[in-house]
A protein has these predicted regions:
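Short loop/turn segments that connect beta-strands within beta-propeller blades
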Residues: 153, 223-227, 267-271, 311-315, ...
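Short beta-strand->alpha-helix linker/helix-N-cap micro-motif
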Residues: 49-118, 131-137
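Bacterial N-terminal signal peptides
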Residues: 24-37
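A flexible loop/linker signature enriched in serine peptidases of the S9 family
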Residues: 189, 200-218, 234-238, 254-264, ...
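Hydrophobic beta-strand positions that form the internal "hydrophobic ladder"
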Residues: 196, 251-252, 292-296, 336-340, ...
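Amphipathic beta-strand/beta-sheet edge segments enriched in Tyr/Trp
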Residues: 113-180
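Conserved beta-strand position repeated across blades of beta-propeller domains
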Residues: 243, 287, 331, 375-377, ...
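Residue-level detector of Asp-centered blade-edge/turn motifs that repeat once per structural unit
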Residues: 190-192, 246-247, 290-291, 334-335, ...
């Protein structure tokens, strides 16, 4: 039976067989040093929008409203252009609005104040909603932002808010505005303020250890669009498969810092680390339960790679599976009642589901020759994404649990694997080699709008914060 290893090693793929990185990490097989203040704090809103502003802007019948986001009016530097571009990108990401391209605004007069907004010119351009914003810098470290969303037809204000705080958080203000507009106009939880964590070799370092010339990989985090990437670990060892805690304040991952795989948790605001498995056996691929109190992971502590569940602090350990095969890559259902995972008990890796109590095991994928690395969607979607062998490569597929059907969302552009859902379930992050190196991409759940997130080095196994 393939992949039957009693101890994870950093060997290369068997001749003639290319094994997806996620399953390879499971049978091969982060931590530490996150500085205090690694993540920027959210900007402060200057009070809630007036209660009478509840206008929802619509487009022509059967079409989304057309939005325009020109540069904010700024008293210094490129702050206004940055806010305008980032906000446009954020609103465009969710596809709830048709975003009128910014390069078509050249003929529109620039408004220096809200009472100068040229509604007639915007209407002639076919715009339904326009953002007007200003940004001031009262001192070197502070910005003050005002933003209004106008209904171009009625000239009424549909959204208005003020923000103030650190000038270093300029992009975060734009993300916040986008999420609040999506919430107010579409009752949609946007993802502009969310973050991705991933493993990367971008530091290009090498170390000698139990496995010679092993590539160093560290854990990184970045904004959902790839901006503001920063390093979480500095162990100069192999650190892989990071996952977020539900409160987005901690990252659990697998680290080879001791020469074998073990589970660590980086507390990213405190700059501290935890090691809940405490070096007992070899442990890898942790994942938090939806309430954050438990961790499911793979361990060979009893001689074979099996799934275990423990409390976050390492107490309450119990074994979930008991099979001679390899059971790995767990993912929790949104209600915490079930766990999907990869097992090669049928001869090739396939996706299975088991109750969180270890009962009611069933095989999910039956039409795939090879299926790996499941990830369970958040509500209201009821589906599991996974990587599947397709011809000579690997692509992302989605299994609809209600309908019992599978759809494919990537199609032969390199190797595509390690999917991870956004917290609103509308997007997936994944690893792809379509550009010639391993990079993180995002894609809508219907397979449209693939976007490259990382470019520096090689990047692997993304996870999306709440």
């Amino acid at each position: 039976m393939p992949f039957r290893l009693s101890r994870p090693t950093c060997q290369s793929d068997p001749p003639g067989r290319r094994v997806p990185a996620a399953f390879r990490a499971a049978v091969l097989l982060g931590v530490v040093c996150a500085a205090t203040g690694l993540l920027a704090q959210a900007p402060t809103g200057g009070g809630s929008q007036p209660s009478e502003i509840q206008l929802v802007i619509s487009g022509e019948p059967g079409t989304p409203p057309r939005y325009a986001v020109p540069d904010f009016i700024a008293d210094a530097g490129d702050m206004g252009r940055t806010l305008g571009q980032v906000l446009w990108d954020d609103l465009n990401f969710e596809r709830e609005f048709y975003m009128v391209p910014r390069d078509t605004y050249a003929t529109i007069p620039i408004a220096r104040s809200a009472d100068q907004v040229p509604f007639t010119a915007w209407r002639e351009l076919g715009v339904d909603a326009v953002v007007f914003g200003t940004v001031q810098r009262p001192d070197a470290n502070t910005v003050r932002i005002q933003v209004r969303l106008f209904n171009v037809r009625t000239r009424q204000v549909a959204f208005a808010k003020e923000y103030s705080g650190s000038a270093a958080n300029l992009r975060l203000y734009a993300h916040t505005i986008a999420d609040e507009i999506h919430q107010q106009q579409r009752a949609l939880r946007g993802v502009a303020r969310t973050k991705l964590t991933f493993s990367s070799d971008r530091n290009r370092e090498k170390v000698n250890g139990p496995v010679q010339n092993r590539d160093v990989k560290e854990i990184y985090l970045a904004d959902y669009d790839g901006a503001n990437a920063r390093r979480v670990t500095t162990t100069r060892q192999l650190n892989i498969t990071p996952v977020w805690s539900p409160d987005a304040r901690a990252i659990a991952y697998t680290s080879y810092r001791r020469g074998y795989p073990d589970i660590f948790i980086a507390l990213i605001y405190q700059g501290l680390q935890e090691n809940p498995t405490n070096g007992t056996g070899q442990n890898w691929l942790p994942v938090f339960s939806p309430d954050g109190t438990r961790i499911c992971f793979t361990s060979n502590r009893d001689g074979n790679p099996e799934l275990y569940v423990m409390n976050r602090d390492g107490s309450g350990l119990r074994r979930l599976t008991n099979n001679p095969a390899i059971d790995t890559t767990p993912t929790w259902s949104p209600n915490g009642a079930q766990i999907a995972f990869t097992s090669d008990r049928s001869g090739q890796p396939q996706i299975y589901i088991v109750g969180a109590d270890g009962l009611n095991l069933r095989r999910l994928t039956t039409a795939e020759s090879y299926a790996d690395r499941p990830t369970w969607s958040p509500a209201p979607f009821n589906e599991i994404a996974f990587a599947a062998r397709t011809g000579s490569g690997y692509d992302i597929k989605v299994y609809d649990l209600a309908a019992g059907t599978t759809r494919q969302i990537t199609f032969g552009e390199g190797t595509n694997e390690s999917p991870a859902y956004s917290p609103n379930g509308r997007h997936l992050a994944f690893t792809s080699t379509r550009t010639g190196s391993s990079q993180i991409f995002t894609i809508d759940r219907d397979g449209r709008n693939a976007r490259q997130v990382t470019r520096d080095g090689n990047n692997f196994t993304p996870a999306w914060s709440n």
